Curated annotation (Swiss-Prot):
Cross-link (Tryptophyl-tyrosyl-methioninium (Tyr-Met) (with W-91)): 244-270
Chain intervals for the UniProt region annotation (Disordered): 198-230, 371-390
Catalytic residue list: 92 (proton acceptor)
Covalent cross-link (Tryptophyl-tyrosyl-methioninium (Trp-Tyr) (with M-270)), residues: 91-244
Record-annotated site: Transition state stabilizer: 88
GO MF annotation: an example: metal ion binding
Gene Ontology BP annotations: cellular response to hydrogen peroxide; hydrogen peroxide catabolic process
Cofactor(s) in the UniProt record: heme b
Catalysed reactions, semicolon-separated: H2O2 + AH2 = A + 2 H2O; 2 H2O2 = O2 + 2 H2O
Pfam annotation, one family: peroxidase
This protein's encoding gene: katG
Oxidoreductase keyword on record: yes
The protein's name in its UniProt record: Catalase-peroxidase
Length: 756
């Protein structure tokens, strides 16, 4: 008998069949407990902003410039310069961002971890990160991987003759994969069947040549895109494991017009308009090449599936030398310009100079080459100076020529290279900084001074702030105004709960609750909101007019203060005296500083804390609650105590009684938990969709309460019930109020990066 067969240990800790295997639809609370001190080796007292400010920024940039042209035998640089590879690394780090939920992006250095480190679209970026490890190692804690990846892309552009718009640091690393991001439901790499449902598959075109005259295509419906492809929200990539689109065309079908539709949708979901999209593609493809030297079956497993001896590398390549001229990355073998390590306008020049015909790369991927052998010898080889090539293009490149809107922009950039340079610089900065949040988080000497609308600008506070005496007087005015506790609390919640920890957007600062589009969202009950805001604005005007030293209170501060006053009054109604912490310093943005379309993405499709759902969704209401809680950076206990408190404060949209398990609304008691856990009642569904319920007295049959799925999950889900039992116990009232005030204050201050 072998030694192995005698061993009684078949599995290590954490192995075996999991709860998720048994109950795949079980509510996942693990996403509320990511990135704790238990996984962070830096320690709880680590201050990344302080460390970054002590960094010799120019020295880091010089070290990166040195890396650019110091080719390594283990991964030789194309054309003797790593710049294009590093641009791709930074682009793919930032390009996972999507507007729908603000998740993805470069802000946490997630490219180091699964699944991103093993996505098919990120082949060879394991090598890029390893090339800059000596720089990271040298500066250690003073610069995060997240910042270094983006900075390396910037330095790469500059080292190849491009003037960037700027760079800001301030992206602290995390130390584990983000489990909250929904990347899709497909179970195979490059699958797209789930995100597009059962929609019509793309059909191969009958002709693989595009002629030079764009008017022949301008009004032609793509033969490969009859019918709209509706991409699942909040996804912003067409296939599992891609950043944006399939460069060969939709589902690998080489149709540039159909490709343009995918490009417009995916780049749009990353907050890019048509001009920014063209600039990013034309600017990015001014550099470097793609890699498809041989058949894809030569490529080994991705990093997460590779052997220990690979030490984090993946995609080992057995074709030829497996590197240099034998590299296989995307399977496409395309070089766009004759100066792939120097900024130029040649990408657009070549795009419009030739008639293009379909061909295949050595790996068998669809790509395009000039007709009739045109352009032969124009393009240098990346590793062999004795070889020359014709220019080549991707299907997604030709989209810029044969989509009418993209073509118009591309031709303008072709005629005006300085416009492309400016547009690319701005779009690149937006791409790499979109998820950083407000300017208060931006660090470093290259932070641009220009105010950009997509940054959700907020004016600087230039006046004296209210003091404790003013705060007490203002709270008195608010409580005497005739507004109810529920109105005060719901208004403050409406303002603050737009915050997204993913891209640091939203929150109460800026006072945008009074502006379009937020003032008109159904979830904010516009008629009630207008009344509350009118009352608060009168209090604000009266206070500000009475000051002789320039002291002011903003409406943003007053909204939060009103909520605090409401919470304090509700606690007083329950017999407890509390003071809700309040820190003034918020400012009021203008409508001109507010991009209505951009802010529309912050409108909640569901807010379980207000028992609101905009429509019916495949995702359960309780899952949407957890999603909202995660964006608010709440833990499971914080989510639980917050919801239980808001229910008894009666802030449900439309004054719905679902979940208001108390006969003393606007009183901060633990009644929600006591009555939910009451065994004297029995719950039954009252709708065929199992989304509303009623509790009847077991003896009399009398209806005592009604509730939603969001309410009942706190008694149904074992972990949430355990937490609810803490707050539903006989001795829990004081602890409940204390914890509620703490998490309420946390939410009100989520966007106060100026306090850090």
């Amino acid at each position: 008998m072998s030694t192995e067969s005698k061993c009684p240990f078949n599995h290590a800790a954490g192995g075996g069949t999991t709860n998720r295997d048994w109950w795949p639809k079980q509510l996942n609370l693990k996403i509320l407990h990511q990135h704790s001190s238990l996984s962070d080796p830096m320690g709880e007292d680590f201050d990344y902003a302080k460390e970054f400010k002590s960094l010799d920024f120019e020295a880091v940039k010089q070290d990166l410039r040195d890396v650019m042209t110091r080719s390594q035998d283990w991964w030789p640089a194309d054309f003797g310069h790593y710049g294009p590879l590093f641009i791709r690394m930074a682009w793919h780090s930032a390009g996972t961002y999507r507007t729908g939920d603000g998740r993805g992006g470069a802000g946490a250095g997630q490219q180091r971890f699964a699944p991103l480190n093993s996505w098919p679209d990120n082949v060879s970026l394991d090598k890029a990160r390893r090339l800059i490890w000596p720089v990271k190692q040298k500066y250690g804690r003073k610069i995060s991987w997240a910042d270094l990846i983006v900075l390396t892309g910037n330095v790469a552009l500059e080292s190849m003759g491009f003037k960037t718009f700027g760079f800001s640091g301030g992206r602290p690393d995390v130390w584990e994969p983000e489990e909250d991001v929904y990347w899709g439901s497909e179970t195979t790499w490059l699958g797209g069947e789930e995100r597009y449902g059962a929609q019509k598959k793309m059909q191969q075109p009958g002709d693989g040549t595009l002629v030079a005259e764009p008017e022949n295509h301008a009004n032609e419906e793509s033969r490969t895109a009859s019918g709209e492809r509706n991409l699942e929200n909040p996804l912003a990539a067409v296939q599992m494991g891609l950043i944006y689109v399939n460069p060969e065309g939709p589902e690998g079908v080489p149709d540039p017009v159909a490709s343009a539709r995918d490009i417009r949708e995916t780049f749009g979901r990353m907050a890019m308009n048509d001009e920014e999209t063209v600039a990013l593609i034309a600017g990015g493809h001014a550099f470097g090449k793609t890699h498809g030297a041989g058949p894809a079956d030569n490529v080994g497993p991705e990093p997460e599936a590779a052997g220990l001896e690979q030490q984090g590398f993946g995609w080992s390549n057995k074709f030829g030398t497996g590197k240099g001229g034998d590299t296989i990355t995307s399977g496409l073998e395309v070089t766009w310009t004759s100066t792939p390590t120097q900024w130029s306008n040649e990408y657009l020049e070549n795009l419009f100079a030739f008639d293009w015909e379909l061909t295949k790369s050595p790996a068998g991927a669809h790509q395009w080459t000039p007709k009739n052998g045109a352009g032969a010898g124009k393009i240098p080889d990346a590793h062999d100076p004795s070889k020359r090539h014709a220019p080549s293009m991707l299907t997604s490149d030709l989209a810029l020529r044969f989509d009418p809107a993209y073509e118009q922009i591309s031709r303008r950039f072709l005629a005006n290279p300085e416009q492309l340079a400016d547009a690319f610089a701005r779009a690149w900065f937006k791409l790499t900084h979109r998820d950083m949040g407000p300017l208060a988080r931006y660090l470093g000497p290259e932070t641009p001074t220009e105010e950009l609308l997509w940054q959700d600008p907020i004016p600087d506070v230039t006046h004296p702030l209210v003091d404790d005496q003013d705060v007490a007087a203002l709270k008195g005015k608010i409580l005497d105004s005739g507004l109810s506790v529920s109105q005060l609390v719901s208004t403050a919640w409406a303002a603050a709960s737009t915050f997204r920890g993913s891209d640091k957007r939203g929150g109460a600062n800026g006072g945008r609750l009074r502006l379009a589009p937020q003032k008109d969202w159904a979830v904010n009950q516009p008629a009630q909101l207008a009344n509350v805001l009118s009352t608060l604005e009168s209090i604000q005007s009266e206070f500000n007019a009475a000051q002789s030293n320039g002291k002011k209170v903003s409406i943003a501060d007053l909204i939060v203060l009103a909520g605090s006053a409401g919470v304090e009054q509700a606690a007083k109604n329950a017999g407890q005296q509390v003071t809700v912490p309040f820190t003034a310093g918020r400012a009021d943005a203008s409508q001109e500083q507010t991009d209505v379309e951009s802010f529309s993405f912050l409108e909640p499709i569901a807010d379980g804390f207000r028992n609101y759902q905009k429509g019916r969704y495949k995702v359960s209401a309780e899952s949407l609650l957890v999603d909202k809680a995660q964006l608010l950076t709440l833990t499971a206990p914080e989510m639980t105590v917050l919801l239980g408190g808001l229910r008894v404060l009666n802030i449900n949209v439309g004054q719905s009684k679902h979940g208001v398990f108390t006969d003393k609304p606007e009183t901060l008691t633990n009644d929600f938990f006591k009555n939910l856990l009451d065994m004297a009642v029995e719950w039954k569904a009252t709708s065929g969709a199992n989304d509303t319920f009623e509790a009847r007295d077991r003896k009399t049959g009398e209806v005592k309460w009604t509730g939603s799925r969001v309410d009942l999950v706190f008694g149904s889900h074992a972990q949430l019930r355990a937490i609810s039992e803490v707050y539903g116990s006989a001795d829990a009232q004081e602890r409940f109020v204390k914890d509620f005030v703490a998490v309420w204050t946390k939410v009100m201050n989520l966007d106060r990066f100026d306090l850090a």
